[in-house]
């Protein structure tokens, strides 16, 4: 049995920062114009009504409203933002 501690290699001990991708605002959530909806690589989800697409394929809201995930056809998912319903009070 060794009674000396093994010395750790100084070449280890690093890792890269994760990209923090994914959905940031879910269906039914109220968003403001400019809010990021999805961070993604490639167009896994396409922009729908009132949604813009950034240079890195990030989807963001163009108007204040409510998020809705939809299927444009069988395989093409899209996210849209619809104006929030104004309650009569």
Curated annotation (Swiss-Prot):
Keywords: Ribonucleoprotein, Ribosomal protein. GO terms for biological process: translation. This is Large ribosomal subunit protein bL27. NCBIfam families: L27 (TIGR00062). It comes from Microcystis aeruginosa (strain NIES-843 / IAM M-2473). Belongs to the bacterial ribosomal protein bL27 family. One of its GO terms (cellular component) is cytosolic large ribosomal subunit. GO terms for molecular function: structural constituent of ribosome. Residues 1-24 are annotated as: Disordered.
């Amino acid at each position: 049995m060794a009674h000396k501690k093994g010395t750790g290699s100084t070449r280890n001990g690093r890792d890269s920062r994760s990209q923090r991708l994914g959905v940031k605002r879910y269906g039914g959530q109220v968003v403001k114009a400019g809010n990021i909806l999805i961070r993604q690589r490639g167009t896994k989800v396409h922009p729908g009504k009132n949604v813009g697409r950034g240079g890195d394929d990030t989807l963001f809201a163009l108007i204040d409203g409510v998020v809705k995930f939809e299927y444009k056809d069988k395989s093409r998912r899209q996210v849209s933002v619809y104006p929030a319903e104004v309650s009569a009070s």
